From Swiss-Prot:
The lineage of its organism: Bacteria, Thermotogati, Thermotogota, Thermotogae, Thermotogales. GO terms for molecular function: ATP binding; phosphoribosylformylglycinamidine synthase activity. InterPro entries: PurS (IPR003850), PurS-like_sf (IPR036604). It comes from the Bacteria. It holds the Pfam family PurS. NCBIfam families: phosphoribosylformylglycinamidine synthase subunit PurS. This is Phosphoribosylformylglycinamidine synthase subunit PurS. GO terms for cellular component: cytoplasm. Its EC number is 6.3.5.3. The gene is purS. It comes from Thermotoga maritima (strain ATCC 43589 / DSM 3109 / JCM 10099 / NBRC 100826 / MSB8). It is found in: Cytoplasm.
Length: 82
């Protein structure tokens, strides 16, 4: 069966605070003197999936996101094929 590679980019929804991102943003601006206007953290998950075709592989990745990898209440995600 073919192997498909995906990256899932996850970050907080825009209406959810990102305390770690806010702290890093403040340190870069105030302590390091860098002109950082806005910083938000996220995570990237890389997955390799065996499936019959690309569409089935994408369905598997989407199911993994919805059931475990992403908290839809506070996070949003985007899937990219690698």
């Amino acid at each position: 069966m073919p192997l498909f590679k995906f990256a899932i980019d996850v970050q907080y929804r825009s209406n959810v605070r990102d305390p770690r991102g806010e702290t890093i943003e403040r340190v870069l601006r105030e302590e390091k003197g860098l002109p950082v206007k806005k910083l938000r953290l996220g995570k990237s998950i890389h997955l390799e999936v065996e499936a019959e075709n690309k569409e089935k592989a994408y369905e598997i990745v989407k199911k993994a996101c919805e059931e475990l990898l992403v908290n839809p209440v506070v996070e949003e995600y985007e899937v990219r094929e690698l």
